[in-house]
Structures are given as structure tokens and as C-alpha cells.
Swiss-Prot record:
Pfam families: Pneumo_phosprot. It comes from the Viruses. Plays critical roles in regulating RNA replication and transcription through its interactions with multiple proteins. Tethers the RNA-directed RNA polymerase L to the nucleoprotein-RNA complex. Recruits the M2-1 protein, a processivity factor that is required for efficient transcription of viral RNA. Acts as a chaperone for neo-synthesized nucleoprotein by forming an N-P complex that preserves N in a monomeric and RNA-free state and prevents the association of nascent N with host cell RNAs. Recruits the host phosphatase PP1 to inclusion bodies to regulate viral transcription. It is found in: Virion; Host cytoplasm. Residues 169-194 are annotated as: Oligomerization and binding to RNA-directed RNA polymerase L. The gene is P. Residues 123-128 are annotated as: Binding to host phosphatase PP1. Keywords: Host cytoplasm, Phosphoprotein, Viral RNA replication, Virion. Residues 135-157 are annotated as: Binding to protein M2-1. Residues 281-294 are annotated as: Binding to the N-RNA complex. Homotetramer. Interacts with protein M2-1; the interaction between the two tetramers is required for the anti-termination and elongation transcriptional activities of protein M2-1. Interacts with host phosphatase PP1; this interaction recruits PP1 to the inclusion bodies. Formation of a complex PP1/M2-1/P allows P to target host PP1 phosphatase to the M2-1 substrate. Interacts with the nucleoprotein N; the phosphorylated phosphoprotein P binds to N-RNA complex. Interacts with the monomeric RNA-free nucleoprotein N. The modification Phosphoserine is found at S106, S148, S157, S158, S168, S171. Residues 12-28 are annotated as: Binding to monomeric RNA-free nucleoprotein. This is Phosphoprotein.
Length: 294
């Protein structure tokens, strides 16, 4: 069974729209009279009962010819109509005129092509007025809307067209998806290996060797890809390090002196606090012993 092509469907839609418009126009005419009943029987109309009057054919109008003059002036006939004067151009002017008309200008178009400007308003395939109430149903409107698209917009508005998504992105999600796909392939191979072990010995060994080889190749590809990405990241890190430096901060001489002073004060403060803590601990121990003795 062969289905109609797109152009055939458009042609049929155009023809149906034209027939519908013609039928609507015929219904609007006041002179439209029914010559048949709903069942299909013939109905006698007034125009059929009355005899049409005979109309005589129109006669050709007689043209009166002007009387010829009996005498002539200087041996020649008098001319009633003046001849149109024809301008005779020189051959040089003719060449210049043709060059101007044929040779293209700076934009690459001849004057004749400039006169013929292409019409920017592209006509729709089917024209209809949706504002008229009761003329079209919703289904007819949808069909006419689909058929009335411009030819240039058919590719964008067609329901059958679709855009293939570009999967060549270098994002982390795309890499993870590719790794997941390869791992799912490996799992599928392992399952087929388990199923193949139930067969004959020779076939089982051959299938097992082939599947193991494919599995090793896939694992090697994954490791190679991971190493390549790691090498790229390390190289990028080295490039950044050469630009920024090793990140160490060096103190000036004054900063070193201030640092020593701060360190000395912090150590001396810590030693005093430690001595105070020791004294308080000893006092607490003596109090505890005194309480036990009492």
C-alpha cells in the first residue's frame, strides 16, 4: 500500500479549499435557486415555465466613408493623418544606450534586473478568513492553518521534522554517560558468558575467549581514556603553576623581626600561664589532702 506524498496532500487540500469557497460563494448569491429537491427529484422553477423572448443579434455599425476630393494639390493626394516622427539615433548613441541597459552596475545587477524586484510578501498556499462565524469548523481551521504555511517555513513548522541533538560535548556528564555505557556493555558480555557456559565444550571455550578479549579491550579503552584526561589535567595544572608560581610567600627583613617579637611574646605568655596553672594545681592537691586528714 503506497501512501500519498506531501505535495499530493497539499494539492488535494488546495482543491478541497477551492471547492469549499466556490460552494460558499454560490450559497451567498441571491439568484441561486434550487432546481432539485433534497431527495434528488427535479423541481420546476419559474424560469423554466416562462418562454424566453427572442433577442435579435446586434447589427454591425455602418461607418461613413469620407468623400474623396476631386482635385489634388501639386499632383499629390492631401494627407488627412500626420505620420509619427521617428527619431533617428546615431550609431554611437545606440551603443551607449545598450551598454547602459545591459552592463551591470557596482552591485552586480543590470537596470532591467533592478526594475524586477522580487516580491517579499510570499503568498500562502490556502487563503481563508477565520473571522467569519460558522464558516469553518475547528478541524477545518486546523487543517487550513497547516496547509497555509509558507514554503520557507515548512521545514520549521512540519510535525514530521526533528533536530538531532549534538552529543559531542566534552562535559563531565557526557564522559560519565560514555563510561556508564561501556560498563553496561561489559555487564551484558558477562551475562552472555554465563549463558554460553551451558553449551557444548568447544563452542563454550570459543565464546568465552572471544568475550574475554572484547572485555579486556573495553577495559583498556576506559583506562586509556582516564589516563589521557588525567594527563591533560596535570598539564593544565603545570601551565597554571608556571604562570602563578609555586605560591610561597617570603617575608622581608622588617617582617622577620616583627615575627620574632611576636613569637617571643607568645612563648613568654604561655610559660607564665603554665606556671600559674601548676601553682593552682598544687594548692588544690594540698587542700584535698587537708580535707582527707580532717
Amino acid at each position: 500500500m503506497s501512501f500519498p506524498e506531501g505535495k499530493d496532500i497539499l494539492f488535494m487540500g488546495n482543491e478541497a479549499a477551492k471547492l469549499a469557497e466556490a460552494f460558499q460563494k454560490s450559497l451567498r448569491k441571491p439568484s441561486h435557486k434550487r432546481s432539485q429537491s433534497i431527495i434528488g427529484e427535479k423541481v420546476n422553477t419559474v424560469s423554466e415555465t416562462l418562454e424566453l423572448p427572442t433577442i435579435s443579434r446586434p447589427t454591425k455599425p455602418t461607418i461613413l466613408s469620407e468623400p474623396k476630393l476631386a482635385w489634388t494639390d501639386k499632383g499629390g493626394a492631401i494627407k488627412t493623418e500626420a505620420k509619427q516622427t521617428i527619431k533617428v539615433m546615431d550609431p554611437i548613441e545606440e551603443e551607449e544606450f545598450t551598454e547602459k541597459r545591459v552592463l551591470p552596475s557596482s552591485d552586480g545587477k543590470t537596470p532591467a534586473e533592478k526594475k524586477l524586484k522580487p516580491s517579499t510578501n510570499t503568498k500562502k498556499k490556502v487563503s481563508f478568513t477565520p473571522n467569519e462565524p460558522g464558516k469553518y469548523t475547528k478541524l477545518e481551521k486546523d487543517a487550513l492553518d497547516l496547509l497555509s504555511d509558507n514554503e520557507e517555513e515548512d521545514a520549521e513548522s512540519s510535525i514530521l521534522t526533528f533536530e538531532e541533538r549534538d552529543t559531542s560535548s566534552l562535559s563531565i556528564e557526557a564522559r560519565l554517560e560514555s563510561i556508564e555505557e561501556k560498563l553496561s556493555m561489559i555487564l551484558g558480555l558477562l551475562r552472555t558468558l554465563n549463558i554460553a557456559t551451558a553449551g557444548p565444550t568447544a563452542a563454550r571455550d570459543g565464546i568465552r575467549d572471544a568475550m574475554i578479549g572484547i572485555r579486556e579491550e573495553l577495559i583498556a579503552d576506559i583506562i586509556k581514556e582516564a589516563k589521557g584526561k588525567a594527563a591533560e589535567m596535570m598539564e593544565e595544572e603545570m601551565n597554571q603553576r608556571t604562570k602563578i608560581g609555586n605560591g610561597s610567600v617570603k617575608l622581608t627583613e622588617k617582617a622577620k623581626e616583627l615575627n620574632k617579637i611576636v613569637e617571643d611574646e607568645s612563648t613568654s605568655g604561655e610559660s607564665e600561664e603554665e606556671e600559674e596553672l601548676k601553682d593552682t594545681q598544687e594548692n588544690n592537691q594540698e587542700d584535698d589532702i587537708y580535707q582527707l586528714i580532717m
